[in-house]
């Protein structure tokens, strides 16, 4: 391993730990709505759970606006992250690193992570995430909503609003494998 690649690996590991720390800080004990996005941004200063993000924070802004019915600003992001926690809304990424690989490669780990989080509802954001993860999550008996939600960028903002609002209203089908023989 060269000195350059070693330094790059350290930077990436530090960035991952920072993302994990902030995400844990804003996770509630019980998750009502789990949002699964594609991957964290490659820019190290941007992430859904960072309280200070100066540019390109559209996923956070649209989720906060639709869930909390409040207008997000750069100044109130920390408060809105706390309110999302109180609303039991939590976001994870299909890939824990900025995307490097086929989406399907990350699905088995995603299923395990989602089982541990045990949410009441799962909303998949972005078509490739839906295409890779919907069937495996559903087949695993997890409460995934069958709504394809686009990422709120590149002109898809209005489509995101419509699809995400619909996904929030729908109740996922009760998955048989989540029931015990006694109760279900």
Positions of PLM-derived features:
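A polyampholytic, Gly/Pro-enriched intrinsically disordered region
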Residues: 163-184
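Compositionally biased, intrinsically disordered low-complexity regions enriched in proline and serine
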Residues: 48-50, 161, 180
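Short, charged, surface-exposed secondary-structure boundary motifs
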Residues: 153-163
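A polyanion-binding, active-site-adjacent surface
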Residues: 2-154
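Polar low-complexity intrinsically disordered regions
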Residues: 1-4, 119, 177-184
């Amino acid at each position: 391993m060269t000195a350059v690649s070693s330094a790059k690996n350290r930077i990436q590991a530090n960035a991952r730990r920072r993302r994990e720390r902030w995400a844990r800080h804003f996770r509630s004990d019980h998750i009502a709505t789990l949002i699964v996005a594609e991957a964290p941004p490659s820019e190290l200063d941007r992430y859904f759970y960072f309280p200070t993000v100066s540019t390109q924070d559209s996923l956070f802004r649209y989720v906060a606006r639709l869930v909390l019915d409040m207008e997000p600003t750069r100044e109130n992001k920390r408060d809105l992250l706390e309110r999302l926690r109180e609303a039991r809304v939590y976001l994870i990424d299909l890939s824990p690193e900025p995307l490097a690989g086929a989406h399907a490669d990350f699905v088995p780990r995603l299923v395990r992570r989602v089982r541990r989080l045990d949410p009441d509802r799962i909303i998949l954001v972005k078509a490739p995430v839906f295409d890779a993860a919907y069937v495996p999550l559903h087949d695993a008996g997890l409460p995934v909503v069958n709504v394809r939600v686009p990422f709120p960028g590149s002109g898809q903002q209005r489509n995101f609003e419509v699809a995400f609002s619909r996904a929030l209203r729908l109740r996922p089908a009760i998955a048989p494998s989540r029931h015990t023989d006694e109760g279900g």
